[in-house]
A protein has these predicted regions:
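Small-residue-rich helix-loop
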Residues: 274-275, 279
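C-terminal regions of proteins
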Residues: 282-384
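Membrane-embedded segments
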Residues: 69, 75-163
């Protein structure tokens, strides 16, 4: 009997210690709230610099958009995250807005975040959706941090709650949040409050403060090597159907939906050519236009051929553009101060003008290549 009581007491003590330990961990992580999903008040010097949100983009954005009554949204990949500012004056009557683009997402993920937004944000009136070639690659699978369960609801998913409060990664992120908040209290981190990415933090932490040319080289090589980007490519019918679902639902809900192809730098289009995917690139545009008119900012126009120098006014590297260029994109799409936008930047594609436009891009590419053989060779040298 004595041994039984001893075991019972030991078990109770162990449970008590474990419960206290977990409560302390949960309290610690809840206070520092490294992914900014709990809603803990921020205290300067302790927990206000949330740089760790970058490792839980899909989680924190699903929660963040629920904290406002959004009237306008941006959707797409990290190109949209960097380039589009919700405070653009052309959207002044559609505030607040939120940049709900998700890093490296495929079209299915983008569709599901669209579904999430319209399920929880009944006031949304306008959506601007950026489309990228790689988003429609059959090999581009859902990212590991994508979870269906957190979408379509304003409540925090139980699995996410555990991840935020009790997981080892969250504890490490909380420690880093304390360190960053204490050592760099005025640093905004990777994201602004409206969901737009901070290019300065990205250049520092992701590109290790490298100059423009090393950044171009790093990104282009990545696109050429990775099978889910340009390494291999098969246009996904399923992803086209996901886009069509977004278009159809927007029409049914009376939401103004603007579609556009990102204005990456000319070297990004050279990477598509070097990868042997130019015909697939054009086939993708044809498939898009069959679904809806779409603004095309790609190609070799006066903006995408910006001279490569350090610093650059409009580009971070070949794939991602800055707010300065994003403002011109929005000027064109929203017909806001159209006189500020070069005439060759942004063409509304329809079945009527598509083939002429594709032919014009081929001619523009030949002229650009003749004038820039150094950069043609630069991209070709990166092919694995």
């Amino acid at each position: 009997m004595s041994n039984h009581k001893d075991y019972r007491c030991y078990g109770l003590r162990l449970l008590t210690v474990t419960a206290v330990f977990l409560a302390l961990i949960a309290g610690f992580n809840g206070f520092f709230d490294p992914y900014q999903v709990i809603g803990t008040p921020t205290i300067k010097g302790l927990n206000q610099v949330k740089r760790e949100k970058d490792i839980q983009v899909r989680l924190f954005k699903a929660v963040a958009v629920n904290k406002i009554e959004a009237k306008s949204l941006f959707l797409g990949s990290s190109r949209t995250e960097f380039g589009l500012d919700t405070h653009h004056p052309g959207l002044s009557d559609l505030q607040p807005g939120y940049n709900l683009a998700i890093t490296g997402g495929n079209m299915y993920e983008v569709r599901r975040y669209f579904d999430h937004a319209i399920a929880t944000q009944p006031e949304v009136k306008e959506i601007i959706l950026s489309l990228d070639f790689f988003m429609f690659n059959q090999a581009k699978k859902n990212t590991p941090d994508f979870r269906e369960e957190r979408l379509g609801t304003r409540n925090l998913f139980v699995g996410d709650l555990f991840e935020v409060l009790l997981s080892k990664p969250a504890f490490i992120s909380s420690l880093r949040t304390l360190k960053n908040s204490f050592s760099r209290p005025n640093n905004p981190g990777f994201f602004y409050e409206d969901g737009r990415r901070n290019p300065d933090s990205t250049i520092e932490q992701v590109y290790f403060n490298q100059g423009v040319i090393p950044r171009f080289r790093m990104v282009l090589r990545d696109f050429l090597v990775r099978p889910d980007l340009y390494g291999t490519y098969q246009l996904s019918v399923d992803y086209l159907n996901d886009l069509n679902a977004v278009i159809t639902t927007s029409q049914q809900r009376g939401i103004r939906l603007h579609l556009f192809i990102s204005p990456s730098h000319a070297l990004q289009w050279e990477a598509i050519r070097v990868a042997g995917l130019w015909s697939e690139f054009e086939a993708w545009k044809r498939a898009l236009v069959n679904l809806s008119p779409i603004w095309d900012f790609s190609g070799y126009n006066s903006m995408t051929t910006e001279a490569i120098a350090d610093p650059m006014q409009y580009y971070i590297e070949s794939s991602h553009y800055r707010k300065e260029l994003g403002d011109l994109v929005l000027n064109r799409i929203l017909d806001y101060r159209p006189e500020t936008v070069p005439s060759d930047f942004g063409i509304l594609l329809t079945p009527t003008n598509l083939e002429t436009h594709l032919e014009q891009i081929r001619r523009d590419r030949e002229l650009w290549a003749q004038e820039n053989p150094k950069w043609v060779e630069f991209v070709e040298a990166l092919k694995p």
